[in-house]
Amino acid sequence: MKFTNAVHFLLDGEAVILTKAGVSLHDVETHAKKNLVIQHIDWKVEDAEKGGYPHFLLKEIMEQKKTIPKTSQINGEELKKIAKKIKVHKKVVMVACGTASYCALAAKYFFAKSGIQAQSYPAYEFLPFAKFCDKDTVFIAISQSGETADTLIAARSAKKAGAYVVAVVNARGSTLERLADTVLLVGAGPEIAVVSTKAFTSQLATLYLLAHEVGGSISLAQKNLKDLGQTLEGWLNQTLLNKVVALAKNIL
Protein backbone atom coordinates (compact mmCIF):
# COMPACT_ATOMS: atom_id res chain seq x y z
CA MET A 1 0.00 0.00 0.00
CA LYS A 2 2.96 2.30 0.56
CA PHE A 3 4.05 1.91 -3.06
CA THR A 4 0.87 1.02 -4.97
CA ASN A 5 -2.78 0.15 -4.56
CA ALA A 6 -2.91 -1.69 -7.91
CA VAL A 7 -2.92 -5.48 -7.60
CA HIS A 8 -3.44 -8.65 -9.62
CA PHE A 9 -4.83 -11.52 -7.58
CA LEU A 10 -3.22 -14.78 -8.64
CA LEU A 11 -5.51 -17.64 -9.64
CA ASP A 12 -4.63 -21.31 -9.22
CA GLY A 13 -2.14 -22.31 -11.90
CA GLU A 14 -0.71 -18.81 -12.41
CA ALA A 15 2.84 -17.62 -11.82
CA VAL A 16 4.45 -14.20 -11.96
CA ILE A 17 7.93 -13.41 -13.25
CA LEU A 18 9.49 -10.22 -11.87
CA THR A 19 12.41 -8.65 -13.73
CA LYS A 20 13.91 -5.21 -14.10
CA ALA A 21 11.91 -4.94 -17.31
CA GLY A 22 8.62 -5.42 -15.50
CA VAL A 23 6.04 -7.99 -14.45
CA SER A 24 4.71 -10.83 -16.59
CA LEU A 25 1.99 -13.38 -15.83
CA HIS A 26 2.15 -16.97 -17.06
CA ASP A 27 0.23 -20.23 -17.00
CA VAL A 28 2.20 -22.70 -14.86
CA GLU A 29 1.55 -25.70 -17.12
CA THR A 30 1.72 -24.21 -20.63
CA HIS A 31 4.02 -21.27 -19.79
CA ALA A 32 1.76 -19.16 -22.01
CA LYS A 33 1.75 -15.47 -21.20
CA LYS A 34 -1.48 -14.10 -19.74
CA ASN A 35 -2.86 -10.62 -19.29
CA LEU A 36 -2.72 -9.04 -15.86
CA VAL A 37 -6.13 -8.11 -14.47
CA ILE A 38 -5.48 -5.04 -12.35
CA GLN A 39 -7.75 -4.12 -9.46
CA HIS A 40 -7.39 -1.26 -7.02
CA ILE A 41 -7.78 -1.69 -3.27
CA ASP A 42 -9.11 1.16 -1.14
CA TRP A 43 -6.97 0.52 1.96
CA LYS A 44 -4.65 3.32 3.01
CA VAL A 45 -1.06 3.17 4.27
CA GLU A 46 -2.13 4.23 7.76
CA ASP A 47 -4.54 1.28 7.87
CA ALA A 48 -1.51 -1.03 8.04
CA GLU A 49 0.41 1.04 10.61
CA LYS A 50 0.07 1.12 14.39
CA GLY A 51 -1.00 4.75 14.42
CA GLY A 52 0.61 5.61 17.75
CA TYR A 53 -0.56 2.49 19.56
CA PRO A 54 2.05 0.17 21.13
CA HIS A 55 0.79 -2.79 19.08
CA PHE A 56 -1.79 -3.70 16.43
CA LEU A 57 -4.07 -5.61 18.78
CA LEU A 58 -4.82 -2.54 20.88
CA LYS A 59 -5.30 -0.41 17.76
CA GLU A 60 -7.75 -2.90 16.27
CA ILE A 61 -9.73 -3.17 19.51
CA MET A 62 -10.09 0.61 19.60
CA GLU A 63 -11.11 0.81 15.93
CA GLN A 64 -14.28 -1.18 16.58
CA LYS A 65 -16.15 1.97 17.56
CA LYS A 66 -15.88 2.94 13.87
CA THR A 67 -15.83 -0.42 12.07
CA ILE A 68 -19.04 -1.77 13.63
CA PRO A 69 -21.28 1.19 12.66
CA LYS A 70 -19.54 1.30 9.27
CA THR A 71 -21.00 -2.14 8.60
CA SER A 72 -24.47 -0.57 8.49
CA GLN A 73 -23.44 0.96 5.15
CA ILE A 74 -22.79 -2.43 3.52
CA ASN A 75 -24.13 -2.96 -0.01
CA GLY A 76 -27.90 -2.90 0.44
CA GLU A 77 -28.65 -4.45 -2.96
CA GLU A 78 -26.51 -7.48 -2.17
CA LEU A 79 -28.27 -7.89 1.18
CA LYS A 80 -31.67 -7.76 -0.51
CA LYS A 81 -30.64 -10.26 -3.18
CA ILE A 82 -29.39 -12.79 -0.63
CA ALA A 83 -32.35 -12.22 1.70
CA LYS A 84 -34.78 -12.84 -1.16
CA LYS A 85 -33.19 -16.23 -1.86
CA ILE A 86 -33.27 -17.13 1.83
CA LYS A 87 -36.95 -16.20 2.15
CA VAL A 88 -37.85 -18.30 -0.89
CA HIS A 89 -35.79 -21.41 -0.11
CA LYS A 90 -35.51 -21.18 3.70
CA LYS A 91 -32.39 -23.36 3.62
CA VAL A 92 -29.29 -21.70 5.07
CA VAL A 93 -25.99 -23.42 5.81
CA MET A 94 -23.03 -21.53 7.32
CA VAL A 95 -19.43 -22.67 7.67
CA ALA A 96 -16.29 -21.08 9.10
CA CYS A 97 -13.16 -21.90 11.08
CA GLY A 98 -11.77 -20.59 14.35
CA THR A 99 -13.08 -17.24 15.52
CA ALA A 100 -15.30 -16.87 12.45
CA SER A 101 -17.15 -20.05 13.43
CA TYR A 102 -18.55 -18.17 16.43
CA CYS A 103 -20.10 -15.71 13.98
CA ALA A 104 -21.88 -18.61 12.30
CA LEU A 105 -23.08 -19.92 15.65
CA ALA A 106 -24.44 -16.51 16.68
CA ALA A 107 -26.03 -15.98 13.27
CA LYS A 108 -28.14 -19.13 13.78
CA TYR A 109 -29.95 -17.21 16.51
CA PHE A 110 -30.20 -14.05 14.39
CA PHE A 111 -31.87 -16.04 11.60
CA ALA A 112 -34.11 -17.91 14.05
CA LYS A 113 -35.55 -14.59 15.21
CA SER A 114 -36.35 -13.88 11.55
CA GLY A 115 -38.12 -17.22 11.14
CA ILE A 116 -35.30 -19.10 9.39
CA GLN A 117 -33.80 -22.33 10.74
CA ALA A 118 -30.13 -22.06 9.76
CA GLN A 119 -27.39 -24.63 10.28
CA SER A 120 -23.74 -23.97 11.12
CA TYR A 121 -20.71 -26.25 10.89
CA PRO A 122 -17.00 -25.94 11.51
CA ALA A 123 -15.69 -26.00 7.94
CA TYR A 124 -13.40 -28.94 8.65
CA GLU A 125 -16.42 -31.06 9.67
CA PHE A 126 -18.69 -30.10 6.77
CA LEU A 127 -17.75 -32.48 3.94
CA PRO A 128 -19.99 -35.40 5.06
CA PHE A 129 -22.95 -32.97 4.94
CA ALA A 130 -22.14 -31.40 1.56
CA LYS A 131 -24.33 -33.97 -0.21
CA PHE A 132 -27.38 -32.39 1.41
CA CYS A 133 -26.73 -29.08 -0.36
CA ASP A 134 -28.65 -28.36 -3.55
CA LYS A 135 -29.88 -25.48 -5.71
CA ASP A 136 -32.20 -24.41 -2.89
CA THR A 137 -29.33 -24.00 -0.42
CA VAL A 138 -27.90 -20.60 0.49
CA PHE A 139 -24.40 -21.49 1.66
CA ILE A 140 -22.63 -18.76 3.67
CA ALA A 141 -18.85 -19.05 4.07
CA ILE A 142 -17.29 -16.72 6.64
CA SER A 143 -13.58 -15.87 6.62
CA GLN A 144 -11.52 -12.81 7.52
CA SER A 145 -8.83 -13.55 4.95
CA GLY A 146 -10.91 -15.44 2.41
CA GLU A 147 -8.03 -17.94 2.20
CA THR A 148 -8.89 -20.37 5.02
CA ALA A 149 -8.17 -23.77 3.44
CA ASP A 150 -10.95 -25.77 5.13
CA THR A 151 -13.51 -23.06 4.40
CA LEU A 152 -12.52 -23.02 0.73
CA ILE A 153 -12.83 -26.81 0.51
CA ALA A 154 -16.29 -26.65 2.08
CA ALA A 155 -17.40 -23.81 -0.22
CA ARG A 156 -16.22 -25.66 -3.32
CA SER A 157 -18.04 -28.82 -2.27
CA ALA A 158 -21.26 -26.89 -1.63
CA LYS A 159 -21.01 -25.10 -4.97
CA LYS A 160 -20.40 -28.40 -6.75
CA ALA A 161 -23.61 -29.69 -5.16
CA GLY A 162 -25.50 -26.72 -6.61
CA ALA A 163 -25.65 -24.36 -3.63
CA TYR A 164 -25.70 -20.57 -3.95
CA VAL A 165 -22.45 -19.50 -2.26
CA VAL A 166 -22.22 -16.26 -0.27
CA ALA A 167 -18.85 -15.06 1.03
CA VAL A 168 -18.70 -12.91 4.16
CA VAL A 169 -15.11 -11.76 3.93
CA ASN A 170 -12.89 -8.87 4.97
CA ALA A 171 -9.83 -9.09 2.70
CA ARG A 172 -10.36 -7.90 -0.87
CA GLY A 173 -9.62 -10.10 -3.86
CA SER A 174 -9.40 -13.35 -1.91
CA THR A 175 -9.94 -16.84 -3.30
CA LEU A 176 -13.25 -17.07 -1.43
CA GLU A 177 -14.44 -13.79 -2.95
CA ARG A 178 -13.69 -15.07 -6.45
CA LEU A 179 -15.33 -18.43 -5.75
CA ALA A 180 -18.58 -17.04 -4.36
CA ASP A 181 -21.74 -16.16 -6.28
CA THR A 182 -22.27 -13.12 -4.06
CA VAL A 183 -19.91 -11.31 -1.70
CA LEU A 184 -20.60 -9.30 1.44
CA LEU A 185 -17.42 -7.31 2.10
CA VAL A 186 -17.34 -6.32 5.75
CA GLY A 187 -14.82 -3.50 5.19
CA ALA A 188 -13.08 -3.56 8.56
CA GLY A 189 -9.70 -2.83 6.98
CA PRO A 190 -6.47 -4.80 7.46
CA GLU A 191 -6.40 -6.94 10.59
CA ILE A 192 -2.75 -7.59 11.40
CA ALA A 193 -2.88 -8.89 14.97
CA VAL A 194 -3.29 -12.66 15.21
CA VAL A 195 -6.24 -12.33 17.58
CA SER A 196 -9.34 -11.33 15.63
CA THR A 197 -11.20 -8.30 16.98
CA LYS A 198 -12.65 -5.79 14.53
CA ALA A 199 -13.00 -8.32 11.69
CA PHE A 200 -14.94 -10.67 13.97
CA THR A 201 -17.35 -8.00 15.20
CA SER A 202 -17.83 -6.61 11.68
CA GLN A 203 -18.60 -10.09 10.33
CA LEU A 204 -21.05 -10.56 13.19
CA ALA A 205 -22.66 -7.21 12.39
CA THR A 206 -22.92 -8.17 8.70
CA LEU A 207 -24.79 -11.38 9.49
CA TYR A 208 -26.97 -9.44 11.95
CA LEU A 209 -27.92 -7.09 9.12
CA LEU A 210 -28.63 -9.96 6.74
CA ALA A 211 -30.89 -11.71 9.24
CA HIS A 212 -32.79 -8.47 9.83
CA GLU A 213 -33.12 -7.94 6.07
CA VAL A 214 -34.73 -11.37 5.91
CA GLY A 215 -37.04 -10.43 8.78
CA GLY A 216 -37.98 -7.06 7.29
CA SER A 217 -36.37 -4.99 10.04
CA ILE A 218 -33.16 -3.78 8.38
CA SER A 219 -33.71 -0.17 9.47
CA LEU A 220 -33.80 -1.22 13.11
CA ALA A 221 -30.59 -3.23 12.68
CA GLN A 222 -28.80 -0.29 11.07
CA LYS A 223 -29.91 1.99 13.90
CA ASN A 224 -28.75 -0.52 16.51
CA LEU A 225 -25.29 -0.75 14.94
CA LYS A 226 -24.95 3.03 14.78
CA ASP A 227 -26.08 3.32 18.41
CA LEU A 228 -23.55 0.66 19.39
CA GLY A 229 -20.81 2.69 17.72
CA GLN A 230 -21.77 5.72 19.81
CA THR A 231 -21.79 3.62 22.97
CA LEU A 232 -18.33 2.27 22.17
CA GLU A 233 -17.10 5.85 21.70
CA GLY A 234 -17.73 6.30 25.42
CA TRP A 235 -15.96 3.07 26.33
CA LEU A 236 -12.99 2.72 24.02
CA ASN A 237 -10.93 5.74 25.02
CA GLN A 238 -7.81 6.66 26.96
CA THR A 239 -9.70 6.90 30.25
CA LEU A 240 -10.70 3.25 29.97
CA LEU A 241 -7.16 2.28 28.96
CA ASN A 242 -5.75 3.98 32.05
CA LYS A 243 -8.20 2.07 34.26
CA VAL A 244 -7.31 -1.23 32.59
CA VAL A 245 -3.57 -0.58 33.03
CA ALA A 246 -4.05 0.28 36.71
CA LEU A 247 -6.16 -2.85 37.24
CA ALA A 248 -3.59 -5.03 35.47
CA LYS A 249 -0.80 -3.66 37.68
CA ASN A 250 -2.82 -4.43 40.80
CA ILE A 251 -3.44 -7.99 39.63
CA LEU A 252 0.24 -8.53 38.87
For every predicted segment, state its role:
Residues 1-86, 100, 109, 113-115, ...:
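N-terminal segments that mediate ammonia production and transfer
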